[in-house]
Design a protein with these regions (language model features):
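Short active-site oxyanion
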Residues: 1-3, 24-26, 57-59, 92-97
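Active-site neighborhoods of divalent-metal-dependent phosphate/nucleic-acid chemistry enzymes
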Residues: 59-103
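Amphipathic alpha-helical segments within well-ordered protein domains
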Residues: 35-38, 52-55, 72
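Acidic, PIN/NYN-like endoribonuclease modules and their adjacent C-terminal/linker elements
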Residues: 2, 88, 92-121
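A secondary-structure boundary/capping signal
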Residues: 6-7, 33, 101
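A generic structural signal for short hydrophobic patches within well-formed alpha-helices
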Residues: 10, 34-37, 68, 105-106
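Short, well-structured N-terminal submotif of metal-dependent ribonuclease cores
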Residues: 1-29, 38-52, 121
C-alpha cells in the first residue's frame, strides 16, 4: 500500500478537487474513513454509488488489536479525537504516509503526513 487517505483527501478526490492526481500506487482508507464517507449526511444515491465504487478500488484497513492499542495511546498522549487517532494509528501500523490536509495531524510524533493541493470549484 502506497499511502492511507484521510477522509478529507478522499472527499477531495471524489469531488474532483485534487489539483494533481495521486501518484501511481495502491491506496487504503481506514474503516473510520469508510464509515464517514458512507454516513455523510447529505449523500445522494448517485454519490453513494460513487463512494462505493471508490471503496471497491482501495484497501479497507480494518481495526486490528494493534491498531486499537496504538489509537488508544495516541488519544491519551496527543489528545486526538478518537476517529483521528484510529486513522493515524492505521497509517503508522502499516508504515505508510497519511494523505491529509488536517494540519493538526502533521504534529503527531512518528506519523508521516502529506498534504494535497486542492482546486476550489
Amino acid at each position: 500500500m502506497t499511502g492511507l487517505l484521510d477522509t478529507n483527501v478522499a472527499l477531495y478526490l471524489l469531488g474532483g478537487q485534487l489539483a494533481e492526481p495521486l501518484p501511481a500506487g495502491s491506496y487504503g482508507v481506514s474503516v473510520i474513513t469508510e464509515m464517514e464517507l458512507l454516513a455523510w449526511p447529505s449523500l445522494t444515491t448517485e454519490e453513494e454509488k460513487k463512494v462505493r465504487e471508490f471503496l471497491g478500488q482501495v484497501v479497507i484497513c480494518e481495526l486490528t488489536p494493534s491498531i486499537r492499542g496504538r489509537a488508544v495511546q495516541l488519544r491519551k498522549e496527543q489528545h486526538l479525537k478518537l476517529p483521528d487517532a484510529v486513522v493515524c494509528a492505521t497509517a503508522m501500523e502499516f508504515g505508510v504516509e497519511l494523505w491529509t490536509n488536517d494540519t493538526s495531524l502533521a504534529k503527531v510524533p512518528g506519523l508521516n503526513c502529506r498534504a494535497v493541493n486542492v482546486t476550489r470549484i
